[in-house]
Amino acid sequence: MKRLLIMIVRFYQKYISPLKPPTCRFEPTCSNYFIQALEKHGLLKGLFLGLRRVVRCNPLSKGGYDPVPEEFSFKLRRR
């Protein structure tokens, strides 16, 4: 299942993302973050981290450098 999600994100990166103007406010981009989170923390934790990041990426967000955390926690981080 983890591999399937990574394939879906890579499909998005290759075929859908180039058709849109760049809008991600973070570094690494949300799609790269999602893949890194899945690879580092596995399916459930990576999915949680990736979805949480996508929700945070909006016009009201300050954005900036936001790497995948080394340690996983369900606690929300304050910036």
UniProtKB/Swiss-Prot annotation:
Principal place of residence: membrane
A GO-annotated cellular component: plasma membrane
UniProt keyword terms in alphabetical order: Cell inner membrane, Cell membrane, Membrane
Key word Transport present: no
Subcellular compartments: Cell inner membrane
Membrane topology term: Peripheral membrane protein
Family classification: Belongs to the UPF0161 family.
Task performed by this protein: Could be involved in insertion of integral membrane proteins into the membrane.
Database matches in HAMAP family: UPF0161_YidD
Protein's recorded name: Putative membrane protein insertion efficiency factor
